[in-house]
Amino acid sequence: MTAQQLKNSILLMAVQGKLVPQDPNDEPASVLLERIHAEKERLIKEKKIKREKNPSVIFKGADNTPYEKIGDEVRSLADEVPFDIPDSWEWVRLGNISSYAETKQKVNATSADPSIWGLDLEDIEKGGRLLEYKTVGERKAVGDKTVFTKGDILYSKLRPYLLKIFVAPDDGICTPEIVPFRVYG
């Protein structure tokens, strides 16, 4: 087994919940998802986010197969779910637990405060290490940029395997090739 195969095997075991014992006293994912739903309802009421037109609901059928309901349509996810997960876990779509769609606020770099952080794709190393921290003024940035806030998850939309992913330690603006999103809960 090569080092890469070992790494992939460990990662697969981790996402399947097989590296540590599953404690039956741990809060099930369904409780967290209820809190996230309540938080989203509050944000909708405060008009900070919009209600989804056709939200996705993933559930296990009587045959123990995962299904997804969107609007009135129900379809099997048997071909999309790559492995079984512990009973206390749940499959969800990223949009159900994050503010991906609401984080696309744009600003023109020339009108941005020159002292704020200006992040470019080459500033993030594969694996998530920050290589360089420059302000908008130091970069002499131009064009439209995407606004992000401290704690947002930033990832490269040009790297579908998400090797360039980073949690923002500060507020700032970034190149449109970097997509920020915020996880609820």
Spans of features found by a protein language model:
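Non-catalytic DNA-recognition/assembly elements of restriction-modification systems
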Residues: S9, K18-V20, S76-Q105
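Generic recognition of stable, solvent-exposed alpha-helical segments in well-folded globular domains
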Residues: M1, Q5-L6, V31, S76, ...
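Extended, domain-scale alpha-helical bundle/helix-rich regions
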Residues: L6-V74, A78-E80
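Proline-centric
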Residues: T2-Q4, M13-Q16, F83-V92, I178-G185
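DNA target-recognition patches
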Residues: P66-R75, G95, V107-K140
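Short, well-ordered loop/turn elements at secondary-structure boundaries
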Residues: Q5-K7, V15, A112-D113, F148-K150, ...
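Generic, well-ordered alpha-helical scaffold segments in large soluble proteins
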Residues: Q5, S9, M13, R35, ...
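A short beta-sheet element
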Residues: G143-T146, K150-G185
